[in-house]
């Protein structure tokens, strides 16, 4: 099963490594898609320097906003055959520990919001 966590970013250099590590620690079948809105603080470079095959990045040329980042992420995930898609904020306002319970609920539901 291919599961994807979409993390839009803008100036998340102080949070992004911790967020990625916490997300990937939840389960082995997770990949992460970072959608960076041209963060001037170097967020995209930090992500690329991790050089992790479970992490993908879309670098956008300008700040296009959270909503369009999620739309682009959903489109990318469907093109890449992910079965389950999780959206989270990169600032840890969403607790990565909730990923497993949410994925379990998706076994018997089409949509889980938490």
Regions found by a protein language model. Give the residues of each.
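Donor nucleotide-sugar binding loop of glycosyltransferases
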Residues: 12-15, 39, 95
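Conserved donor NDP-sugar-binding/catalytic core segment of glycosyltransferases
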Residues: 100-114
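Short loop->beta transition adjacent to catalytic acidic/histidine clusters or analogous donor-positioning motifs
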Residues: 2-3, 24-34, 42, 54-55
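Short, well-formed alpha-helical segments that are part of the catalytic scaffolds
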Residues: 12-25
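Short beta-strand-to-loop acidic/aromatic patch adjacent to the donor-nucleotide binding site
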Residues: 82-93
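Short beta-strand/loop segment that forms part of the nucleotide-sugar
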Residues: 7, 30-39, 58-59, 88
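Conserved donor nucleotide-binding strand/loop of the catalytic core
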Residues: 44-80
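A conserved acidic beta->alpha catalytic loop
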Residues: 36-45, 92
